[in-house]
Regions:
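Membrane-anchoring hydrophobic helices of lipid-metabolizing enzymes
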Residues: 10-122, 127-171
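Non-catalytic C-terminal accessory region of glycerolipid acyltransferases
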Residues: 3-5, 10-41, 47-65, 175-297
Length: 297
């Protein structure tokens, strides 16, 4: 009767209000996007200038793509407070002032590796921390390792260089931490960037504790983090193994992969083919783990 109709109308009104609120929030995000992108661009430019790397103009195709990914995936960051609770933002990260132990950020890598630039950008923008990122060496080469296939996108090497990226190796990690630089390392490397079908969020980390021993030797603080969303953002149609086995494109990829280094078991620089499924990225930084009490031997 009347009560049922009133309840129905109230429910419709509440739904309309909720929809209007969501639309207003979305409009606010869209309106703020240019400001966030400009802040990110200026942060990148400042980092590059400090390293003597000129800021390219106009922005590279890779940077334009990153801007689109930022809007599409809306990364959200959390850190762990003294009580062990996750709180929004990065204010709870350990001190990073001069003289503080270097931080070694360790976490899972997500499909296609967009998480790396997102973390670098957020740490620089929110905390003023310029990380040194250890990346797959071919990503820092001027020519695409898969040429003439334009992957990675033009401008990737220059952007990574401006952001302080260095070719990943044990020696590079030692140099970075010994200089007191806060460092980002994805132990799973390219193997996690180009996961196969059915491997969402699986870790492919080496069994060796060498990284922990090195951190202890240099009195670095381990800062573990977990990333979510990236492996849900792509539906893989053909994974790396299927492309390598393809009679059509397999010879092309096999020839190029044979010339590239392998840093993690079974890593191959062959991007899967699939569909983008926009999903928010989440990054949760855990409590810091000092290594001053660990025997590096």
């Amino acid at each position: 009767g009347v009560e049922a109709e009133a309840e129905a109308e109230a429910s419709e009104a509440e739904a309309a209000e909720a929809a209007a609120a969501e639309e207003a929030a979305a409009s606010a995000v869209i309106a703020a996007a240019p400001e966030e992108e400009e802040a990110a661009r200026l942060a990148w430019q400042a980092r590059g200038s400090a390293r003597g790397v000129p800021d390219p103009a106009p922005a590279s195709l890779f940077e334009g793509w990153l801007g689109q990914m930022r809007r599409l995936f809306s990364p959200t960051f959390f850190s762990t407070d003294a009580s062990g609770n996750l709180v929004p933002g990065l204010e709870q990260l350990p001190p990073t002032a001069e003289g503080a132990p270097p931080l070694l950020l360790l976490g899972n890598h997500q499909l296609f590796g967009f998480d790396g630039p997102m973390i670098l950008e957020e740490l620089l923008r929110e905390r003023g921390v310029a990380l040194t990122a250890l990346v797959y060496p071919p990503l820092l080469e001027a020519e695409s390792p898969l040429a003439p296939l334009p992957y990675p996108l033009p401008g990737t090497a220059a952007t990574f260089e401006r952001f302080g990226a260095v070719p990943a190796s044990g020696r590079a990690l030692f140099k970075s931490l010994s200089r007191g630089e806060h460092t980002l390392l994805f132990p799973g490397g390219g193997r996690e960037v180009f996961k196969r079908k059915g491997e969402a969020y699986q870790l492919f980390w080496p069994d060796s504790p060498d990284v922990v021993r090195l951190a202890a030797r240099l009195n670095a603080t381990l800062l573990p983090f977990a990333g979510l969303g990236g492996d849900d953002s792509f539906e893989i149609s053909l994974d790396s193994d299927e492309l390598l086995a393809s009679p059509l494109v397999g010879p092309f990829f096999r020839e190029r992969v044979a010339k590239m280094p392998s840093l993690v078991q079974d890593d191959v620089f062959v991007p899967p083919v699939g569909t983008i499924l926009p999903t928010r990225y989440y990054f949760a930084f855990g409590a810091p783990l000092p290594t001053d009490g660990i025997d590096p031997a």
